Structures are given as structure tokens and as C-alpha cells.
């Protein structure tokens, strides 16, 4: 219901795909992914196979972690002009969004597969059992995506701090919004 309402709010709207809107759409995307993977976890016959595996880790962190971050970033990009009277750098915002979005799915999408392969969570090493040796390369890929995602957050911090002092001064209503906040 929530997803349908979010999508129909955008329907026939005059969308401006600025970083705030991209993060908002990304939030809806992660909720859709979470809803689809949640069906598997909600079905007891399927949940037996993926219970306490990386599938659960991927589902939970994609839905709860990434969605929360997307909401936070959307809010910061949208309300920054109101808070500081300056605009954040839009190009750095686009870089921040696309690198974060690709890396978020690059981290958590493969986790679904290694979870379906049976890799349990809470193991200090995946090479404790010979069966899991084939999954080590996927974990290396996940680690690389996670490190790149961390670097994207450094871009955000730079954009935030630099724009606070040196960003382009904004007009009274930078988003041309008709709501009372602006």
C-alpha cells in the first residue's frame, strides 16, 4: 500500500530529478526489493532454507539500512537550502547518488545469492568449511563495493561542508514549491 501511494504521488507529476528526488525514488526502489525478498522470508517453507543465512542479512540491511540512509540523504539535499541559505553542489550530489545506489545493490544483491547457497551469518570466516570456499570471491566483490560506497559518503561530507560555507547562495524558494514551508 505504501509503495503504491508513493508511486502514484509521482504519477503525472512535474519531476525534477535532482539528488533529493533521486534518493527518494531510490528509497521506493529498496522498499520494492525488500517486499519481494520479504515474501520468501514470510513463507515458512522457503524461510527454513534461508533462515539465519546471508539472505536475511541482505534483506534486513537493504530495507532498513539503505532505505533509512536514502531518506536521510533526500531530506538533507532537499532542506539544505532552507537550513543554510546555500545550495549543495548538484553534480557532486548526482555522483553521490549513483555511486551509492550501484554500490548498495552491489553489496546486498550478491548476499541474497550466497544466502540461498546456504552461507550462514555470524561466522568469523567463510573458509571454515570447504563447501563455502567457492563463495569467497563473491565476498571479496561485496567488500570492494562496500569500500567504494564508503568513498561515496566522503563525497557527500565534502559536498555538505563545502556547500555550507561556499555554496551558491539560494533564492527564497529554490525548488519553486507551493507549500507553506517555503
Regions found by a protein language model. Give the residues of each.
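Short, small-residue-biased leader/transition segments that mark boundaries at the very start
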Residues: 1-3
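Interfacial and helix-entry/exit segments of alpha-helical transmembrane bundles
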Residues: 8-38, 54-57, 62-71, 75-109, ...
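Structural signature of transmembrane alpha-helix termini at the membrane-water interface
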Residues: 8-11, 36-43, 80-83, 106-117, ...
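Generic, ordered loop/turn and secondary-structure boundary motif
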Residues: 16, 47-51, 56, 176, ...
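Membrane-interface interhelical loops and short amphipathic "cap" helices
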Residues: 39-60, 113-138
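Juxtamembrane/interface motifs at transmembrane-helix termini
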Residues: 42-43, 86-87, 178
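Extramembrane terminal tails and long inter-domain/linker segments of multi-pass membrane proteins
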Residues: 117-134, 161-182
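Repeat-solenoid scaffold signature
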Residues: 134-166
Amino acid at each position: 500500500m505504501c509503495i503504491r501511494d508513493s508511486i502514484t504521488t509521482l504519477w503525472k507529476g512535474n519531476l525534477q530529478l535532482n539528488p533529493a528526488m533521486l534518493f527518494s525514488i531510490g528509497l521506493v526502489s529498496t522498499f520494492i526489493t525488500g517486499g519481494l525478498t520479504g515474501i520468501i522470508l514470510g513463507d515458512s517453507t522457503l524461510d527454513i532454507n534461508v533462515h539465519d543465512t546471508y539472505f536475511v542479512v541482505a534483506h534486513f540491511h537493504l530495507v532498513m539500512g539503505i532505505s533509512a540512509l536514502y531518506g536521510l540523504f533526500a531530506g538533507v539535499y532537499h532542506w539544505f537550502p532552507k537550513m543554510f541559505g546555500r545550495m549543495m553542489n548538484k553534480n557532486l550530489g548526482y555522483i553521490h547518488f549513483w555511486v551509492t545506489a550501484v554500490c548498495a545493490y552491489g553489496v546486498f544483491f550478491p548476499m541474497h545469492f550466497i544466502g540461498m547457497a546456504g552461507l550462514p551469518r555470524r561466522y568469523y570466516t567463510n573458509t571454515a568449511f570447504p563447501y563455502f570456499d567457492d563463495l569467497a570471491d563473491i565476498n571479496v566483490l561485496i567488500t570492494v563495493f562496500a569500500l567504494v560506497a564508503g568513498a561515496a559518503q566522503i563525497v557527500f561530507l565534502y559536498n555538505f561542508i563545502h556547500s555550507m560555507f561556499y555554496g551558491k547562495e539560494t533564492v527564497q524558494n529554490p525548488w519553486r514549491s507551493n507549500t507553506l514551508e517555503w
